[in-house]
Design a protein with these regions (language model features):
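An amphipathic, basic-hydrophobic alpha-helix
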Residues: 62-85
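Residues at the starts of beta-strands that form the adenosine-phosphate
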Residues: 7, 32-35, 50, 107-108, ...
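An aromatic- and histidine-rich active-site surface loop
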Residues: 86-105
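Active-site-proximal region of nucleotide-activated glycan assembly enzymes
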Residues: 107-156
Length: 156
């Protein structure tokens, strides 16, 4: 049975972060959900879940700041149209504006640190750790980096 009262935004950059997010498809199907991810040259099938796309951001590019600002405006538009109650994010850079908007609008933010990070935190994780209502790590060792994080196992 689908919970239509709770709207959930699932946000991730492309590649492995999106693959981790898609491992939560049963959760997506349980709620009124939509996905926000980066537009890439390759297509990822997320049907039948609604999907919005942001510009792909690489922190080493000269246009990084410009793309982040553009993504912030795009994220605001998505947020105002969809009005999610909760954002679940697996990172990284392109999704930061959406996560911060979530908190500015008084909504709940859940961040899941990358499966690939076993002993050191991501930059996005270090930032969003201070904003997330729930912060999950996928390795028990990561609780040394994030003392208030929850470890409940791995997505994979």
């Amino acid at each position: 049975m689908k919970d239509r009262k709770t709207k959930v935004c699932f946000a991730a950059s492309s590649g492995g972060h999106l693959e981790e997010l898609l491992m939560m498809r049963p959760l997506m199907e349980r709620y009124d959900s939509f996905i926000v991810t980066e537009k890439t040259a390759y297509e990822t099938n997320v049907d039948p879940i609604k999907c919005y796309y942001l510009r792909q951001v690489n922190r080493l590019e000269i246009a990084c700041a410009r793309k982040l600002v553009m993504n912030a405006f795009r994220s605001l538009k998505i947020f105002l149209v969809e009005r999610p109650d909760l954002v679940i994010c697996t990172g990284v850079l392109a999704t930061i504006p959406l996560c911060l908007l979530c908190k500015m609008f008084g909504k709940k933010l859940v961040y899941i640190e990358s499966f690939a990070k076993v002993k050191s935190p991501t930059r996005t994780g270090k930032l969003l750790y201070h904003f997330a209502d729930r912060f999950y790590v996928q390795w028990p060792e990561m609780q040394e980096c994030y003392p208030n994080a929850l470890y409940v196992g791995r997505i994979y």
